[in-house]
């Protein structure tokens, strides 16, 4: 029974203590945005743009916040590069960077499982690459030993393997990915004023969900509550070969972060036609939509359609004579072979006749 509960804690995001959404009349718009992206992803580009446009007309601040929330969610799922074994080059080399290491369920005796050790190895390698960055380990008690937390065991492992204790930050309360995002944001913004950028480390199948929820928490707090923006600037994973988390887990976590109602069995909302704006929408949603949606292509006007046959007559297509020429040559060869020919006379000298009569 304990093992089952631990597994559920890792898979299902638990309710977290987050402030009310504060969206008021705009709350249904937020629910719609999450449902549209959950069920249609990039194909909902126009509809998502239209909903955020309506929100900005009612409340420019909230509309802009949701525009960024949806942009980042789309980017993380469609364009974000996932790095193996170590964080990428080019991240800040000072203490504005915090490396966030996602926890993983402990064994019943409180010891670290192999997958968590793999995550810590990626974290240690990345911490060596960025020697001035903070390292935040996050995770609560998931074993059977009271007081033994994922964060505590992760910190002990990093210290044992050479990382300075002064660089390690521990978040010991979270029992789900959603709680990780909420509690880490609160801890960093309240107690570590130098931090403005984060890089997330987890397993391959878990990195998309982790990044999506951390970005959503930061965008929501900065856009709605006037909080500090923690920019997601990188990631690194340990390879497990496991399939990615479902998009439904991301949608559920985002709903919890913003205190919005969520039902995973909700019927998919239908897409509706939206008049294309004069200027293209910036972001992954628009980029993918332009590639996949026929109505993003420029449609000819009625005058252009009526003038099209005349234009075709004025500029006829260039004919190719390669095939008729080849066919003619083939026919000539066949005729040359089949038509009977007269024997050709040879011009040779007359040889003297030999006399074979024996005298």
Go through each PLM region and give its residues.
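Hydrophobic core
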Residues: 6-14
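Cytoplasmic C-terminal tails of single-pass
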Residues: 344-359
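A structural signal for short, hydrophobic/glycine-enriched beta-strand patches
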Residues: 18-258, 303-309
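Sec-dependent signal peptide recognition
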Residues: 1-5
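Membrane-interface motif at the C-terminal end of an N-terminal transmembrane signal
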Residues: 13-19, 340-342
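Low-complexity, Gly/Ser/Thr/Pro-rich intrinsically disordered linker/tail segments
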Residues: 248, 253-316
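Alpha-helical transmembrane segments
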Residues: 331-343
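Juxtamembrane/start-of-transmembrane alpha-helix segments at the extracytoplasmic/lumenal side
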Residues: 312-328
């Amino acid at each position: 029974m304990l093992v089952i509960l631990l597994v559920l804690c890792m898979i299902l995001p638990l309710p977290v203590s987050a402030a009310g959404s504060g969206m008021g009349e705009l709350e249904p718009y937020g629910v719609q945005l999450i449902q549209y992206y959950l069920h249609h992803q990039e194909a909902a580009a126009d509809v998502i743009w239209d909903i955020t446009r309506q929100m900005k007309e009612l409340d420019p601040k909230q509309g802009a916040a949701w525009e960024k929330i949806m942009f980042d969610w789309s980017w993380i799922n469609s364009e974000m590069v996932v790095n193996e074994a170590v964080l990428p080059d080019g991240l800040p080399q000072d203490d504005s960077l915090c490396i966030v290491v996602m926890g993983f369920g402990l064994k019943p005796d409180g010891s670290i499982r192999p997958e968590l050790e793999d995550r810590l190895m990626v974290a240690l390698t990345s911490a060596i690459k960025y020697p001035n960055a903070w390292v935040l380990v996050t995770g609560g008690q998931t074993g059977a030993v009271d007081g033994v937390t994922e964060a505590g065991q992760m910190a002990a492992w990093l210290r044992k393997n050479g990382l300075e204790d002064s660089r390690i930050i521990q978040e010991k309360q979270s029992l789900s990915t959603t709680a990780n995002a909420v509690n880490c944001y609160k801890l960093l913004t309240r107690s570590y004023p130098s931090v403005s950028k984060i890089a997330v480390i987890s397993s391959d199948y878990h990195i998309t969900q982790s990044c999506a929820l951390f970005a959503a928490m930061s965008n929501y707090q900065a856009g709605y509550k006037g909080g500090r923006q923690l920019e997601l600037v990188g990631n690194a994973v340990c390879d497990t070969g496991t399939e990615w988390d479902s998009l439904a887990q991301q949608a559920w976590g985002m709903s919890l972060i913003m205190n919005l109602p969520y039902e995973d069995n909700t019927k998919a909302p239908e897409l509706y036609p939206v008049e294309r704006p004069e200027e293209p929408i910036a972001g992954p949603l628009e980029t993918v939509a332009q590639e996949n949606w026929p109505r993003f292509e420029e449609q000819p006007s009625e005058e252009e359609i009526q003038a099209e046959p005349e234009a075709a007559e004025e500029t006829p297509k260039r004919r190719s004579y390669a095939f008729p020429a080849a066919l003619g040559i083939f026919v000539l060869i066949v005729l040359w072979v089949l038509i009977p020919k007269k024997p050709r006379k040879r011009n040779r000298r007359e040889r003297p006749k030999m006399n074979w009569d024996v005298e």
